Amino acid sequence: MSTPEFKVIIVGGSLAGLTLAHCLLRAGISHIVLERRSVIAPEEGASIGILPNGARVLDQLGIYEHIQDTTEPLSTAHIRYPDGFYFSSRYPEIIKERFGYPIAFLPRRRLLEILYTSYPDHSNIYTNKNVIKVQSHDNQVSVLTEDGNTYRGDLVVGADGVNSRVLSEIWKLAGNPSLTKREGRGRTIEYACVFGISSPISDLKPGEQVNAFYDGLTIVTIHGRNGEIFWFFIKKLSRRYIYPDLIRLQQKDAEGICEEAKSLTVWKGVTFGDIWERRETASLTVLDEFLHHTWSWDRSVCVGDSIHKMTPNFGQGANTAIEDSAALANLLHSLIKEKRAEKPTDSDISLLLRQFKSQRLRRVQKIYKMSRFVTRLQARDGLLNTLLGRHYAPYAADLPAKIASGCIAGAEVLDYLPLPKVTGAGWNRGHRRSTMYILLGFTGVFTSALAMVVLLHIRDIAS
């Protein structure tokens, strides 16, 4: 008598969900994807950056070549300050030299299309499937959708984003009434973002990026193939919001926010108004920041934005989600291979999910902390960040490359598929430790020096 196959139910046709579907397909593990919306790749104005840690996994899956066909690799970044000072960095080129892959941006919709069209069996991907309940059974789990259907499997994976229904069901199944409140306290909102895509402007060259820093505001532009402009307008809010007291903005607010900033210079003679007037799409969202502690319960687990959410400043949110999917697929492949003719038991799955969190948490924590730091540095949030950004960063050689490299090295890779031919020495270097020590060490020295200057200034005034 043959053993029933192990089946994974992926909730969410997101980047993390579709990447996991590809990973499981290559591992020979049965799965389905349940997507709440009517289409996998909706017409939305967001763009997404693929960095080497995400690119390497997608390359293993045979997907990256399709991304290459539609993107313009970044080579140069320009950083501009409110006083008109600017400097240029070739850190994108350094990243490519170290890891073999460039930093590349494309519309989120296009990336989802690539993931969907390159997946060979669309009968495994269901749309209009809004999951409303997750239930645990003996050695099995099921999900109920709004249309009344029930899907049974051996593991449920929530890849359903910031307001994850699967994660809320996990917290409910855990049976601890205070869990949701405790986890919620770590979910905050301090920034809002208008993101969009605009038609080309001659002074914004393809393959280049501009970061324009203002007090409480960061404007990022990435210039893609044929000059297409992907942009982010990231504004600090008047106060910090903590769950459940979360601000929700309307799309109509985007116009008011952006109209006020039309005169701000982005690069050379280009103002934000020039970019705004050439917009093809634009959307407004608040930027949640959190790193949850409870990722799984029984036979349910979450990946990607469901459990860790970062601002777009550092560009690692999507790539970290890709890594989550790869790490979980590795563990599932290993377990099923080990069990052979037997299906994994509840205790097997429980151990696997603990291993998943243990394996991922430290790396995710580091990337999350670095993302928060970069966001506030760019927004000139407070005196120390203002001085660090203006008077240290421009003279710190390839600091941006060091910071980025530290969060790329040590990335997850699919251990049951061959490594890509594309590679670089950066994967084997110890950038991770040195980057944090450089920043922490300098911050300590800089703070001490700043305190001395302030004390001397006060003494002079007093005398």
UniProtKB/Swiss-Prot annotation:
Keywords: FAD, Flavoprotein, Membrane, Monooxygenase, Oxidoreductase, Transmembrane, Transmembrane helix. Its cofactor is FAD. The keyword Iron does not apply. This is FAD-dependent monooxygenase nodM. Its EC number is 1.-.-.-. It is a multi-pass membrane protein. It comes from the Eukaryota.
